[in-house]
Amino acid sequence: RIDQGRYKHLNHESVVNSYHAALSGGQPYQFVTDALVRHEQNLRLNILSNLFSRLGLDDFESWASKHLLMVEYFELDIVPMESIENQIKDMVDLRNDASHGEIDNLVNVEIMKSNCNFVIKFLEVIRQFISTKLITKMYSQGQIVKLGKVTESFGKNGAFILTAEKGASITKSDLVFIIESNKYSSQTIESIQLNGINLDTFKITNDASEIGLKCPLLVKNNAVLYKEI
């Protein structure tokens, strides 16, 4: 509770004022870090999912189970929740044994490498999940614009056809936010082509205009592109 224990340095007025400044767009603003980073429970999958849901970021478990990084790690087409839960539980148990007791047997090096690999991939899944939710929210509030949807992809060279939305503009070197099914990335536009002609910039004047674009990496069919206003 505020004003007790580890939170005795806080008071209700300062906490409310800090959040009001942040939500009102005041600059600079400050987060109440005590509320953000302190948690009594080990962050197992259900705890993480619950934390995200309380922030309005729903369906994390479904996102994680279908993400390519989890599919690659577990070598399954769709990863059961139990597989991710058990992986996290095993690491939490290992950490607890090391912190609060004695480990009878040292963990195999390959197991440690596998655990580290999982953590790296899982953190990237979390980053992409939050980024996707953020982009969707920013678009709904008019802070970014939708460029259109990819209707044809030419593979790993990064070239694709975008069916663009009226009113948007695209310029070489633009940073675009790319939302695919269970994946988020950001890339820069390397080239723009219309009717075989290379362009430096293009203003979209008609709905469903098709324009050729190229990014450094593969952009798949049905991906939706956004950019800052």
What are these regions (language model features)?
Residues 100:
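Histidine-centered active-site/metal-ligand motif
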Residues 38-48, 107-108, 112, 167-170:
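N-terminal short leaders/motifs
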Residues 49-97, 105, 109-141:
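Amphipathic, Lys/Arg-enriched alpha-helical patches that create a basic surface
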Residues 5-6, 10, 136-142:
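Noncatalytic linker/hinge segments flanking ATPase motor cores
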Residues 4, 76, 82-83, 196-198, ...:
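Sparse, context-dependent recognition of short Cys/His-centered cofactor- or disulfide-binding micro-motifs
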Residues 142-170, 175-229:
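Beta-strand/loop-dominated core regions that host nucleotide or nucleotide-derived cofactor-binding catalytic loops
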Residues 1-77:
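Helix-loop junctions and short alpha-helical segments
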